[in-house]
């Protein structure tokens, strides 16, 4: 992989990781356009490293939430002993509940080989971009009824986690699934988006650890000095771009909603489908 390919793919990852347009789908399309072999061991390592870089931007932007113990008094009307005990670390407890469904479904998909098959299919990406785009045109009217005082509860966290399971299908978008899941549970767009960011950290960190384990136990011939430098460059680029994209996205979503993202998804998906139907090669690089 060249330096230019590294930078382009990392920018795409950073821009799309937290937008409801499917970062995985865009990565697959971009790699095909640039002629990057998706089944290559180094490309696999590069993919999860730059995703990890993007996820680190959440911890950086919201570090006060991730490294803060709640010392506020337990609500006077709280009678559950367990909730009283976990009150100082309730933030982490909600993330644990939210990530459970994805862990179960993700491991099942990986063990069955379904995940690898889905990740190699540009058709799946294109179709899901269109389907998700159509849904997003109407989701504001369906779910935008949240009130600012709404809080993430254990029940809501688990429900959002179930929505996140849809993102195992490339082109669906983890961000879209979790934000819509939050709105469906009565949260505002801003509150739902922030919890989506938070939930991405344990979800993607867990996936990165699994991928890293598989990689370290496999063929290490790809780990040349050049490739390791490309990994470092990609991680830094995706981190910076994701940080900027995330700050912009929260304000844009609160003001304009999902409509423009929906149209974008539909346009990109239709273009890819037309190219596939007409046997137009996606590979722009010989």
Show the residue positions of the predicted features.
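Multi-pass membrane proteins that catalyze or facilitate reactions on polyprenyl-/lipid-phosphate substrates
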Residues: 1-286
